[in-house]
Curated annotation (Swiss-Prot):
Protein name per UniProt: Glycerol-3-phosphate dehydrogenase [NAD(P)+]
NCBIfam families: PRK00094.1-2, PRK00094.1-4
Entries under PANTHER family matching the protein: GLYCEROL-3-PHOSPHATE DEHYDROGENASE (PTHR11728), GLYCEROL-3-PHOSPHATE DEHYDROGENASE [NAD(+)] 2, CHLOROPLASTIC (PTHR11728:SF1)
PROSITE patterns: NAD_G3PDH (PS00957)
Enzyme category, top tier: oxidoreductase
The encoding gene: gpsA
EC number of the protein: 1.1.1.94
Entries under InterPro entries matching the protein: 6-PGluconate_DH-like_C_sf, 6PGD_dom2, G3P_DH_NAD-dep, G3P_DH_NAD-dep_C, G3P_DH_NAD-dep_N, NAD(P)-bd_dom_sf
Source organism per UniProt: Hyphomonas neptunium (strain ATCC 15444)
Signal sequence extent: none
Role summary: Catalyzes the reduction of the glycolytic intermediate dihydroxyacetone phosphate (DHAP) to sn-glycerol 3-phosphate (G3P), the key precursor for phospholipid synthesis.
Binding site residues for sn-glycerol 3-phosphate: 109, 137, 139, 192, 245, 255-257
Amino acid sequence: MTQHFKTFGVIGAGAWGTAIAQMLAREGQTVHLWALEPEVAAAINTARENTAFLKGVPLKPEIRATNKLEDLGLADAIFAVAPAQHTRTTLRALRASLRPGTPVVLCSKGIELATGEFMTQVLKDELPEAIPAVMSGPSFAIDVAKGLPTAVTLAIEDTRLGTELIQAISTPTFRPYLGTDLLGAEVGGSVKNVLAIACGIALGKGLGRSAHAALIARGYAEMTRLALTLGAEAETLTGLSGLGDLVLTCSSETSRNMSLGLALGKGETLASILAARNAVTEGVATAPVLRRLARSQGIEMPICEAVAAVIEGEITVDDAITALLMRPVKAEAVKP
């Protein structure tokens, strides 16, 4: 373990933020975990469990929950795990206490609805002196929290610093792989949530596993097309933060996005599904802004377009399926 990283801060005490804190604490480092809700911080500090968002997982004593973002300011690295639509607010609140040159690892997978910006741009807007990094890949919170084998991509431009950070956070069951394509990792993590909703809808409607597989494959083409147009590297999309995360999220009901799509396919309304949840489903906010981004770039993303139209209440699930099935036959192209 490198001596450079001894203390970590984690913004967001939902399931994923708590799981990351648990992973970081396994090697004995001190982890300051910021929770929005005072009762969540209290439960973590007293009962050593996040009963609201990650019930049943005993948390390491090295995790210190707090409601004060300034408590994270002296950490050697920050992991930003607040929902994508709240990332800007939390980063802005950290501005006064963060040391210049601190790595901020972005773990939220989404695009800001108000601006159309990915999280790295949001970070540059709010904390220009921070060093941006992105951690993304096929990883369910419960698996990471329980110490089950998981591999992710950690993308950062400074490979020396990235290597030090990976050495500090790697465990026998949590393996980050170093990359430098932050944009590619962000595109993969954002688009796969929307595609998972589509896959859930297909299974909820009983369209079968063949249709499910086709959605994953054609969805991957949409993801890659967007990434290449925006300037990302094709290789990134073949890795953990692209194809790996896509396959996991589109294939398991543990995924919030997949399960939301499944419920939509079975006839539940979006409002009723969201009302019954205490956790954010990132694909719901990402779908409309992803559609705007694709149109602004002149990119065809019919699956993501269909999901956005359903989410916005413009068409029914049945109409979306019909529209996709009626698309003209064409070559199986991936490149824009």
